[in-house]
Design a protein with these regions (language model features):
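Ankyrin-repeat-protein effector appendages
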Residues: 1-17, 150-220
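Conserved hydrophobic residue in the first alpha-helix
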Residues: 17, 67, 113, 145-146
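Conserved hydrophobic site in ankyrin repeats
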Residues: 32, 82, 128, 161-162, ...
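Ankyrin-repeat inter-repeat connecting loop/turn
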Residues: 49-52, 56, 89, 102, ...
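Ankyrin repeat boundary/linker residues
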Residues: 59-60, 95, 105-106, 139-142
Length: 220
């Protein structure tokens, strides 16, 4: 679960960066990264890669990297800024190091992609996958990003559809069909995009094979 970091940052420095990323304060984040980059005489990408909230869970630590927080909050601006720092320009990070940050698993085994998918933030999901997020990674509960987005979709349906049921019933059947065809929940949008993405294709195929195998096994 741990990610090998290029440098060692103080707990206070990491806390400041986490606060900036979580609160969505881009100016403060840029300022803190610049200061730390100067202090450690290294590229800002090293700072981003090294900023892991590694405090034990029982002491309030999450084990998350900076990408987790904007991904969870749907803050595309902060997330895209951090990804740009990691992946663009003379970062002096190799591909494996970038991948380690993008796919970093926190204390619960969740990556930034898991959090973005769970909270149905499609643009954040797209940005992370574009930066190399692995769609197939599962958390400690054995769940991948697609399943988490599906679960969010189920929760939305359970909470939001019941009050409207009576109204739907009095609508013409054709109108109901058109409305359903024209609308897609945020969770479903994330699921469909992940499964249709190049990296999600293999995941969908594997899921289909597993379902078929399970069905075959139940008939024997």
């Amino acid at each position: 679960m741990a990610t090998k970091t290029p440098i060692t940052l103080t707990v206070e420095a990491i806390d400041d960066l986490v606060y900036d990323a979580r609160s969505g304060d881009l100016d403060a984040l840029k300022s803190d990264l610049a200061v730390l980059s100067t202090q450690h005489s290294c590229p800002q990408a090293w700072i981003v890669a090294s900023a892991i909230d590694s405090e034990p869970e029982e002491e309030g630590g999450t084990g998350s990297c900076l990408l987790h927080f904007p991904a969870a909050n749907g803050n595309e601006e902060i997330l895209n800024f951090l990804l740009a720092v990691l992946t663009q320009g003379e970062t002096q990070l190799d591909q494996a190091q970038v991948a380690a940050v993008v796919n970093h698993r926190n204390h619960s085994g969740n990556t930034a992609l898991h959090w973005a998918a769970l909270n149905t933030h499609l643009e954040c999901v797209k940005a992370l996958v574009g930066a190399g997020a692995d769609v197939a990674i599962t958390n400690d509960a054995g769940l991948d990003a697609v399943f988490l987005a599906e679960r969010a979709d189920w929760s939305t349906e359970e909470q939001g559809e019941e009050p409207e049921e009576a109204e739907v019933e009095v609508e013409a059947e054709v109108q109901e069909g058109e409305a359903n065809a024209g609308e897609m929940s945020k969770g479903r949008q994330v699921v469909e995009w992940l499964l249709s993405s190049e990296k999600g294709g293999a995941l969908e195929s594997a899921a289909g094979e597993n379902t078929a195998a399970a069905t075959e096994g139940s008939t024997q």
